[in-house]
Amino acid sequence: AVMGISALCLFASQGLSVSAATIKEENIAHNQALAIQSNEVANWPTGPVVSAESAILMDADTGAILYAKNIHQQEYPASTTKILTTLIASERCSMDEIVDFSYDAVHDIDPGSNHIAIDPGEQLTMEECLNAILIRSANEVSFAVAEHISGTTWQDFAPIMNERAKELGCVDSNFVNPNGLPNEDHYTSAYDLAMIGRAFFANEALCKMTMTHMLHILPSERQPDDIMEVNKMELIPGGKYAYPYLVGCKTGYTDVARSTL
């Protein structure tokens, strides 16, 4: 039996703006042919071939690396960025704090990206915000939480992210926003994301949020809508690829990053 909790981080490769089917087939074949460094260690169990460009399996209790494939290669994290954002929020804020939604927080998100349709001037509790980020991957909520913690703009939250990442042992990362929306200066690695994941998985409340099937925010005097959104994570119980040993998870996707886990 394997003791403790393992953190698994996978990054698919970057794609180009041509046929999606061709990209997928070519990338899978290319990535499956990449070296798996842990398989080159003498007397170490051979790990599986995966279609991700980089991947890591780490014991979350000890930090021991059980599987390694290009673990220090810098990659775009997409919405897996949000495990760092929510971790910092849980460390710095109480769950009943009131978060204000500015015009910038609501309107700085990319068209078509995940959101819960909050309007400028409305408010949520920090607990509602973290649920919205981890269940619905809400980008405007990530901006609002970043503004709340920095006390100014969401851009000023980036130094806080980078400082905390270094404290957690990250060596390959630079974060410039709280939600992982595309930016060439925003990157991490499988190793760094696993190191952040060690701290995230130690927080039972955050893990529980990622496993919740439905986001439900009731109307209040702070915001008038009855917000209901489904968790689209397919690894949680009831999902298409439900994994019985899962304790918490966050996925991400952008056209640049491709799929991240």
Which ranges hold each PLM region?
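Sec-dependent N-terminal signal peptides of Gram-positive bacterial secreted proteins and lipoproteins
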Residues: A1-V18
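Generic hydrophobic, helix-prone segments enriched in Leu/Val/Ile
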Residues: C9-A12, Y76, M228
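Active-site-adjacent loops and short helices of periplasmic peptidoglycan-processing enzymes
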Residues: S19-Y191, M195-E204
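Domain-terminus/edge residues, biased toward the C-terminal soluble/receptor-binding domains
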Residues: C170-V171, P182-Y187, Y191-L261
